[in-house]
Regions:
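Metalloprotease/metallohydrolase-associated module, dominated by Zn2+-dependent proteases
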Residues: 109-117, 127, 131, 135, ...
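Structural recognition of the beta-strand scaffold that forms the well-ordered cores
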Residues: 42, 86-88, 121, 148, ...
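Acidic/His-rich structured neighborhood in mature extracellular/periplasmic domains
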Residues: 57-170, 213, 225-226
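Bacterial Sec-dependent signal peptides at the C-terminal "C-region" and cleavage site
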Residues: 14-25
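Sec-dependent N-terminal signal peptides
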Residues: 4-13
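Acidic/histidine-rich, surface-exposed loop or edge segments in extracytoplasmic proteins
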Residues: 34-57
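A domain-start/cap signature at the N-terminus of enzymes
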Residues: 28-29, 33
C-alpha cells in the first residue's frame, strides 16, 4: 500500500464524520400554528413562553395591524389567495431582515430550516414593533407577501411583470428618485423584476419608502406598471 494513502484515507474518514456530525447537530424548533387575521402564522414556541409573553402579545398585535391593512383594501377573493401563503415568525433568528424563501436549496445550503420554503419569514419578532421599521417600511409584510404571491400564484416568469420591468429600465425613470428620508437615490425596484413587483405593490396598496410612494404617483410615474397592478390586485377606489 502506498505510504501516503493511509494518512489521506484517515483525513477523508475524519472529514466524513465531522460533516455527518454537523448535519446531525442541525436542530430546529417545531413551530406552533396560530391564526392571525385568517393567515396561518408558524410561531417560534419561545414567543409563547411566559418570559416573552409581553413581547409576543405586542408582536401579534402589530402583525394583525399589517394584515388588516391588506385585508380591508383588497377584494375578498384576493385576500383569500393571500391567506393561503404562510408566515413564519421567529423570536431571534440569525437571519435579520424580513424575507420570502422561494427555494429549499438555498435554505439547506445556508443551514436554515428547510420547512421555511414558500414561507414569508419574520426572523426577529422585535422588528414588528421597531420604530425605524414603521418609519421606513410600514408595508414590509405586504412587500414579502407580494413576493410569495408573485411566486406561488402569478409565477416569477409572468411576462407582463417582466415586460413592465424592462420598459421602466429602458426609460430610466427609477434611476434617481426621492427616498422617504428626502434624499435622491437609485430605486430598489431596479434590483430585479421581483423587487419591482413587490415595491409597486407597496405603492399601489399602501405607502412605499421610494418614489412613487402612493397609488396616484405610481399611475403618473409608471403607467405601464400601474396597469399591471390593477390587473393583479383589482381597482382600488
Amino acid at each position: 500500500m502506498n505510504r501516503f494513502f493511509l494518512p489521506i484515507l484517515s483525513l477523508i474518514v475524519c472529514s466524513s464524520f465531522l460533516n455527518a456530525d454537523k448535519k446531525a447537530s442541525l436542530k430546529f424548533h417545531d413551530p406552533v400554528s396560530k391564526d392571525v387575521e385568517g393567515w396561518t402564522i408558524k410561531v417560534d414556541p419561545r414567543l409563547l413562553e411566559s418570559d416573552n409573553a409581553e413581547l409576543g402579545k405586542a408582536c401579534f398585535t402589530a402583525l394583525a395591524n399589517h394584515l388588516q391593512r391588506i385585508k380591508y383594501i383588497l377584494p375578498k377573493e384576493k385576500v383569500a389567495e393571500l391567506q393561503k401563503l404562510p408566515i413564519a415568525l421567529d423570536l431571534e433568528h440569525r437571519l435579520g431582515n424580513m424575507q420570502y424563501h422561494p427555494a429549499r436549496g438555498w435554505l439547506m445550503a445556508n443551514r436554515h430550516d428547510p420547512r421555511l420554503e414558500k414561507h414569508v419569514h419574520i426572523p426577529r419578532a422585535k422588528a414588528l414593533i421597531n420604530r425605524h421599521t414603521w418609519a421606513k417600511h410600514p408595508y414590509v409584510v405586504l412587500h414579502e407577501l407580494a413576493h410569495a404571491y408573485h411566486d406561488q400564484v402569478l409565477s416569477f416568469n409572468n411576462k407582463e411583470i417582466i415586460a413592465a420591468f424592462d420598459n421602466m429600465k429602458s426609460k430610466g425613470i427609477y434611476e434617481k428618485v426621492l427616498l422617504y428620508t428626502g434624499n435622491k437615490v437609485r430605486h430598489y425596484a431596479l434590483s430585479n423584476h421581483k423587487e419591482y413587483f413587490a415595491e409597486s405593490t407597496e405603492a399601489y396598496l399602501g405607502v412605499n419608502d421610494f418614489y412613487p410612494f402612493t397609488r396616484a404617483e405610481l399611475k403618473e410615474h409608471d403607467p405601464m406598471m400601474y396597469r399591471v397592478m390593477v390587473k393583479v390586485w383589482g381597482e382600488v377606489r
